[in-house]
Amino acid sequence: MFDKFIAAAAAFAASLAGAAGTAHAGKDLDAIKARGQVVCGVTTGGISGFMSVDSQGKWVGLDVDICRAVSAAIFGDSEKVKFVPVTAIQRFTALQSGEVDMLSNNTTWTLQRDTALGFDFTGVTYYDGQGFMVNKKLGVKSAKELNGATVCVAPGSTTELNLADYFRANKMSFKPVVIEKVDEIRAAFFSGRCDVYTTDRSGLYATRVANAPNPDDYVILPEIISKEPLGPVVRHGDNQFGDIVRWAQYAMLEAEEYGISSKNVDDMLKNENPTIKRILGVTPGMGKALGVDEKWVYNIIKQVGNYGEVFDKNVGMGSPLKI
């Protein structure tokens, strides 16, 4: 995951040294500005640490903060976001139809989605892999002991395909219990309707911490059966909005590398490092290139944080997940 981030950050730093052009307005961005908010698709039922509703009814999480960063870049206000819950099956139709402007909901970047569906993936925000969770009383230590098991899985996902491929490759059989909504999958698993719950490992850890009746009763098996680069998705065609989503991610990474955080960003405005001056818009040009305010990175970091801050509070050591 971090190799991709470093490469992205390096590209961002290199771009800061070049001359900035002027962005051409795109229809999606024009519609977003006219509406006054970004509409962001998140997962129905939520995933603790990535996207969920807190006790005050506010959406929080790593994926949620990416949407807020995009809002801060466009409007100078991270709160101008509407979150629309969608299932794994609904999400791509919602994006294609314009019901949402972007997805930030643990969607895996695949060749098929990036080409045939008319989408653009703007980067990787979390590099994951698919795993399996079982009740300890099942007595299973490895996924290779799951022959004949009943498995809860979401439809319309890479998870469903990976599951079938893994069992076929290991000459095992399984009985799928296919359920569309994440909260209903969890309920089925914890009620004993299926022996196994399979999804991205981050989701398994989040589910065990946030939803299990007794987290100590459940174990996540050691096998990782796929590579799951997760990140935001936009429609192909309006490159300007896609560029803003992409560079908002890169800016959060670059800010972390240069030690710019939500706590010190005001002091950093006085820093004499030429790159920091360009990042924060003290030296103008990069905002013009994207068609946003020159303080776009400042607004992201001040209101949302750099990538390290966002990771730590949502899924890292500052969170219940402690990834």
Give short role names for the model-derived ranges.
Residues 282-323:
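C-terminal functional modules
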Residues 33-37, 71-79, 96-100, 137, ...:
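Sec-exported extracytoplasmic/periplasmic mature domains
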Residues 14-23:
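C-terminal segment of classical bacterial N-terminal signal peptides
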Residues 68, 72, 76, 80-145, ...:
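Acidic, polar ligand-binding/catalytic clefts
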Residues 25-104, 290, 303, 307:
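Extracytoplasmic small-molecule ligand-binding "clamshell" domains
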Residues 1-9:
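Bacterial N-terminal signal peptides that target proteins for export
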Residues 37-49, 59-75, 108, 128-184:
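Bilobed "Venus flytrap"/periplasmic-binding protein-like clamshell domains
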Residues 65-74, 137-140, 144, 149-150, ...:
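Extended ligand-binding regions for polar small-molecule ligands
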